[in-house]
Amino acid sequence: FAVHVDAVAIHCRLALGWPLDTNEGTLELAKDMWEPDEPALWHKNFSDEIMHWVEVGQPDDKRVMKASGRARRVTVWAFQNSTPIWWDNLTNKVSRANNLTVWQIPTEQSQALGALAQRSMQLQVSVQDGTVWINDGQTTVEITPVKLKG
């Protein structure tokens, strides 16, 4: 059950990326948990070209640069406590990736979002001025991501 809750919590964090990153509503879950060549989310056009590659967590520089080469746009959503250390180590290595945007979800907000994870859930999402409110019918979590690059 703990692994299931972790997976659901990660997908809750993906729920944050969906409303902030799409203007066409065509992002789809990929197979990143079991397919190393795929992101967490992506948007492909009808020619199967990757328009937008979305990573969640702290990918290494090789993965970020690979994504940058394959997609028109790459977004990383980092949510761990160690994000500042990870980003300090990664900044210079990915500086030439001009199509890369990196966001940090503050730790407290990420934990509150993860706490919404249930086996079965419905979430309502509102976005205004870069702030996201996610509600599960009982609890509302406010997320204000911090842009690290892009």
Predicted regions and their residues:
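Acidic-basic catalytic patches of nuclease active cores, encompassing PD-(D/E)XK
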Residues: 1-33
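Short connector loops at helix/strand junctions that flank enzyme active sites
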Residues: 24, 36-38, 49, 69-71
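Conserved catalytic cores of phosphodiester-cleaving nucleases, focusing on short active-site segments
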Residues: 41-43, 50-67
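Short amphipathic beta-strand/extended segments with alternating polar/hydrophobic composition
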Residues: 51-57, 140-148
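Short hydrophobic alpha-helical runs that function as membrane-insertion/retention elements
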Residues: 55, 73-78, 101-103
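An exposed acidic His-Trp-rich patch
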Residues: 60-85, 89
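Domain-level recognition of nuclease-like catalytic cores that cleave nucleotide substrates
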Residues: 86-140, 145-146
